[in-house]
Amino acid sequence: MKYYSTNKQAPEATLEEAVVKGLAADKGLFMPFTIKTLPQEFYDSIDTLSFQEIAYRVADAFFGEDVPADTLKQIVYDTLSFDVPLVRVTKNIYSLELFHGPTLAF
């Protein structure tokens, strides 16, 4: 799959190029030209899935064409091995606290 810059002023990139570069030459973010649609079954059963399984299925929609399923699953489960609390902000708004991971980055 090819990736484009959100600023649309840089050459297309492969997944490897996008990951290694981080940002496109025009300072845009790399996005895939197409993202596989998640099936309705995913949404119907999302409340029964672990955070890691949800992340894997979403990552597969972005990268599945370029990364073998078992490799992608291993990457997701290794990198998201920490608790992610779901915190109520207001009556109908919740937030995932992603900053509890080892890098405190999110």
Model-identified regions with their sequence ranges:
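PLP-dependent amino-acid enzyme catalytic core
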Residues: 1-106
